Amino acid sequence: MPPAPPIAAPETQPTPATEARTTPPPRPQTRPSPTPLPQVPQISDEIIVPPDAKVMYRETGWASWYGPGFQKRKAANGEVFDTEKMTAAHRTIPLNSIVRVTNVKTAESVVVRITDRGPFVGDRILDLSRAAARKLSVYQHGTALVRIEVLQTPAPIGTGGRWCVQIGAFQDPNDATKLKEKLGRRYRTAKVLQFSSPQGGDWLRILVAEDDKKRAESLIKETHTDAAMFLVRLD
């Protein structure tokens, strides 16, 4: 609410970008720790798309990839994150949705499952696993303009859901603590959590009353901070 694994020659390991640019800086992006939700059974690696699947939602924007620091950690849907599985992170598409992702420039396309929340950097809309990033030519460049098409989802996209606000990253933990205390006094029905990212920096997550989307959107409008603020779906 604001992140890498036999061939003939060693493979160069690029680093995820921190900005949506042609030549991203050589350092991994900072992403917050995955949401601590209850453990769920691991789902099969195979992603099956019904032949009659219709596109339920479209979005175009910048995608990056993540992995360093998050391998074998719990993702937002409760699974253990694996950089070699075809998964991705999105801030608002329901978890476990099946999504087709197309590189606008190269026309390369893959199907992934949304298992995590993010990215929490600028105007990016999607964070890909390393495996998915390789197939979309995102791995080498760090970012790419992509088109997202939701093909299957376990819950409605436009209505319902459980929502929160994520703020960060704070390089000084004291700044995060001060804002946490301020928000706690102002929104007594909300729960404010403070946590650290594996890549560094502190984050705040504000759980609004009844996990209501409109309450979360209002909180974003009413809160003044230099840190980035993100509307995040929890389920």
Residue ranges and their predicted role:
Residues 171-235:
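Extracytoplasmic
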Residues 1-178, 195, 221-222, 233-235:
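Secreted/periplasmic proteins
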